[in-house]
């Protein structure tokens, strides 16, 4: 059994549940698990980068929103936004209510807000330019056309326990849902700790060189 594949994950959920009458519900449990993971987990493998050309005077820029198996790219949360000028400018976030009362003038964009599926620049650029977006994208949902994804490959146990937790309402007390919830929470905590270590270098004590 390859737990890092859609078929392997379904088989593992089936074995853990130990109930043949729920086999047709397993894809639903996995879909619900993906919704949970999109809400609760942020990993480096969920990060994407995109470059967008912006015309002079343009304020609204569409966010990535592709929902196609094998080419899934749906924006969830901004990590970094850079206007490529000389020097480049890191844009800061502005709440939509402040953007609504901001005077529309052209110049060098320094801020942005997000409304719906678009980001809006403040100020509107006075010349053509380029934006570089770094963002968290949705986990590509597993299916026959999408047999794996980076999150499943990186932490299949997290995927498995999330699916088992979502199966809870269907088991009607016949499965150890509380235990699976604990396993899911523990796996999520380990992922968060691993991500933290990867992003921030810890202080390393260096021994002095011994001269001979």
Range-by-range predicted roles:
Residues 1-212:
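Glycine-enriched, solvent-exposed interface loops adjoining structured elements
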């Amino acid at each position: 059994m390859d737990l890092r594949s859609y078929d392997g994950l379904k088989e593992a959920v089936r074995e853990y549940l130990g109930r043949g009458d729920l086999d047709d519900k397993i894809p639903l449990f996995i879909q619900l698990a993906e919704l949970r993971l999109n809400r609760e987990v942020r990993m480096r493998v969920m990060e994407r980068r995109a470059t967008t050309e912006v015309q002079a005077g343009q304020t609204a820029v569409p966010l990535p929103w592709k929902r196609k198996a094998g080419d899934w790219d749906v924006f969830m949360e901004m990590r970094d936004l850079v206007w490529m000028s000389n020097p480049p400018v890191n844009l800061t976030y502005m709440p939509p209510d402040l953007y609504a009362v901001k005077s529309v003038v052209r110049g060098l964009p320094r801020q942005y807000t997000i409304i719906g599926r678009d980001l809006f620049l403040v100020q509107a650029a006075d010349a053509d330019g380029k934006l570089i977006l770094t963002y968290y994208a949705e986990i590509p949902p597993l299916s026959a056309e999408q047999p794996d994804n980076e999150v499943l490959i990186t932490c299949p146990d997290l995927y498995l326990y999330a699916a088992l937790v979502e199966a809870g309402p269907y088991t009607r007390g016949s499965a150890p849902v509380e235990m699976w919830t604990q396993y899911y929470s523990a796996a999520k905590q380990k992922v968060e700790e691993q991500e933290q270590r990867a992003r921030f270098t810890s202080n390393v004590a260096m021994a002095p060189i011994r001269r001979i």
